[in-house]
Amino acid sequence: ATVTNAIATLRGGAKITNITANCSMTLSCCGSYGGVPVILTCGHGGQSPNDIIKYASSSGSTIGNVYIHRYYDGDIGDFEIIKITNTDTFSTSNSINNMYSITGTLSSPAVGTIIKYYSRTTSSFGYGSVERRNVTVLADDRDNISGLTEVKVTSGSCESGDSGGPFFQDASSGAKYCGVLHGKRTDSSGN
């Protein structure tokens, strides 16, 4: 949906589109980088810094441009940081789909930790357990991306367009942000 002359709130789980790469993905979380408001999503949904990111679809309002892009052979992680340049239209929230508020981070979840994620394409939450850490995968049949955490999904599904979405731990003290959904299956058992 196009948002004009009003403040729209960006939050984890929202649909965003890289119009330069013609790719829809999911917003992971909002924050700031060097004092600048930003959003975080997957790196494999884009091509390079300065790609244009829009809210919802290619006809939506422009959010901003890719500021930092990580998704090349030998990179650690699969993410990009988008600088919000349209601050007259967009505000940010630390919530995930208006259901969970991010109260902190869990940057190194231990093996066995139960992790939740949000599937934008099915409008549902799923979960799984951390199987391995610091995993390297062959992405797009050509690039080795390392530093990933492998989660065995035991409930829910991940579809095309869910990439970039939030992974988090649902703790009694609030949701702890863990990272960005990469969405690559490593085998047929749900990993």
Which residue stretches match the model-derived regions?
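Catalytic nucleophile loop of clan PA
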Residues: G156-V180
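Residue-level marker for beta-strand->alpha-helix junctions and adjacent short loops that shape enzyme
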Residues: G46, T122, G174, R185-D187
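Autoinhibitory propeptides
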Residues: A1-A6
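Short, Gly/Ser/Thr-enriched beta-strand-loop segments that form substrate-interacting elements
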Residues: N22-S24, K152-S155
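Membrane-proximal bilayer-interacting regions
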Residues: A139, N144-V153, K176-N191
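Serine endopeptidase catalytic core focused on the charge-relay Asp
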Residues: A8-G147, Q169
